[in-house]
Curated annotation (Swiss-Prot):
Belongs to the UPF0178 family. Pfam families: DUF188 (PF02639). This is UPF0178 protein PSPA7_5991. HAMAP family: UPF0178. NCBIfam families: PRK00124.1 (NF001095). Coiled coil: none annotated.
Amino acid sequence: MRIWIDADACPKAAKELVCKFALKRKLEVWMVAGQPQVKPPFACVRLVVVESGMDAADDYLVEQAEPGDLVICSDVPLADRLIKKQVAALDPRGREFDARNMGDKLAMRNLMADLRDLGQMGGGQAPYGDRDRQAFANALDRLLTRLQREAGLRANQPHK
């Protein structure tokens, strides 16, 4: 199991939390970015800078992440592509994406984009704060525990 981060859009505080959890649980972290980033100084962290281009980092994440992995991303269409591949997805504010909520999240994302395009609404989310950080830490802990438990169950099943 690996943790992937859509590094261009992920707040620094969330990246730091992922690294702490990965160190504690002995997991690999792959930060994928379209622009150069500062790599955290931990052996468990790898940084991949993809060629620039529309959705290049997203495409790399979808191609490389495997079922049972976790991707940290804010991008709803990316999360939808990952969920369809049985890859877990969590946003840096602690909201898990799954097959049950994906339709609603895509519809809400499209509505907000339309409202912004029409000038009916300002852009962007509120700044990343302590509540977001705590919600993310709690959700990350729960999700990693579940994914590691599921990976252990899969590993103990006889091959057919």
